[in-house]
Amino acid sequence: MKRLARTLLTGAAGVALALAVVSPALAEPNPIDYTSPPEVDGQQVMKIGHSVNMEWSSHTAILKRFAELVAIYTRNEIVGEIYPGAQLGGEPEMVQQTRQGVLQVTLPATNNLAALAPSLNVFILPYIATSTAEVNHLQDELTPTLVPRVIEEAGVRIVGWENSGWRAFFYKADEPIERPEDLADLKMRVPPNPIMIASYKAWGGNPTPLAWSELYNALQQGVVEGGDNPVTDVMGMKFDEVINRMTKFHYTILTHPIVVSERWFQGLSEDHKAAVLRAGEEATAYIRWWQPIDEAKWWAQAEEAGVEITEITDESEWIEKARAIWPDYYKDIGDDGEALANEALAIIEEFKRQQ
């Protein structure tokens, strides 16, 4: 994460900062709980909004950690207030509030933020990476290029990353999804992202763009028969009550950048900027340790709930069909979309060679 750390510190007026991250298993207990930090003179509130209402979601885990670290590194001069469960609006609304400085921090899905910051669509290209290690490395290496672009496009600054896990098919059907043609008879919900919609069409599926907040009722009423999300979301939102199957594959991982209002950030002192950037860096390292442990728990719960789980062991047909759409969507990344996609591929190939 060294290159990411260097970039996140850009704009901190050369403040030297030690970014060594203590393993969460060995770290001292946090002296501050984000819900009740001690008051100090001139204390300012950092409003944090996100869309998930699960107490122990990876959203909650990383944002609590981030808020605690900001409080610690600013000596309680900046304290966080977390508003979960879309209390402040959906993700598009919260991104708008963040770019305006009304909200200081939010955690949108990359595919949702890409509506304002198209450069991030490079992460949405299907099968651009096929392992969590590749995704983490790509984030670390490509973020230096993306930070200034996203600031210009959306008015928000990436200070860290949360990965919720690989998107898996969840659905109600008599037979499992194993090959692309198995999607033909299923109405599947997709986020309103053009690349994700095109991926389903390439597989011969029937994508139905639908807001996340509408999904449970749509499944219950048969408007759609499934979709794809990490198992944490599927089980946390109790979709197992209205679906009976899940299929594991690796076409894209659900990622969420921690973004702060650039307007707010530029109004901070240099010490406070450095503290926010350090907190984002360390919260990223923390969630990368925490998330796989949590995800394994949710898969076990899905199995216990009676969900039939299938794993696609040979994804070559899925990969071939999905990657064929890439050239059509370089423009959705930007004028240099192809070059940015090639840079991402080169980063991953170099990473593979080093393993």
Question: Where in the sequence are the language-model features?
Answer:
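Short, solvent-exposed linear motifs at loop/edge-of-secondary-structure regions
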Residues: 7, 20, 321-324
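Bacterial N-terminal signal peptides
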Residues: 11-20
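Polar helix-capping/helix-linker motif
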Residues: 10, 140-141, 193
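Signature of the catalytic double-stranded beta-helix
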Residues: 137-151
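N-terminal secretory/targeting leader peptides
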Residues: 13, 26-134, 151-153, 157-355
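Bacterial Sec-dependent N-terminal signal peptides
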Residues: 1-10
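Secondary-structure junction/capping motif
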Residues: 5, 56-57, 141, 145
